[in-house]
Regions:
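Conserved catalytic core of sirtuin-type NAD+-dependent deacylases
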Residues: 1-109
């Protein structure tokens, strides 16, 4: 790991060169991209499913479709203001910029 004041390391420069040579790329992100915005991930130490294992049930389509209590609990959480004050972070903005420049072929999250 290099100190940020030293500039990008060799691995970062090599990755940037590969992306530039590709023209456009597919990007795969997970919930972790949003943690800097204050949105918890799922399996991390403060993750949604780590702190509330029952919440994982809402992610299973078979359970979600057949259990009205799971659906109700999920909608209560979603409507409870958990998104208030949340703003895109530098990672989100970088992906938007990358897309606007034509470098993003596909984004899967």
């Amino acid at each position: 790991m290099t100190d940020a004041s030293e500039g990008p390391g060799k691995e970062t420069i090599d990755a940037a060169s590969l992306v530039a040579a590709a023209g456009s790329v597919a990007v795969l992100t997970g919930a972790g991209i949003s943690t800097d915005s204050g949105i918890p991930d799922f399996r991390g130490p403060q993750g949604v499913w780590t702190l509330n294992p029952v919440a994982e049930q809402a992610s299973r389509i078979d359970v979600y479709l057949t259990d009205p209590e799971v659906r109700k609990a999920n909608w209560r959480v979603m409507a409870g203001g958990m998104w208030d004050g949340v703003e895109p972070n530098v990672g989100h903005r970088a992906l938007v910029d990358f897309d606007r420049r034509g470098g993003l072929h596909t984004l899967v999250t």
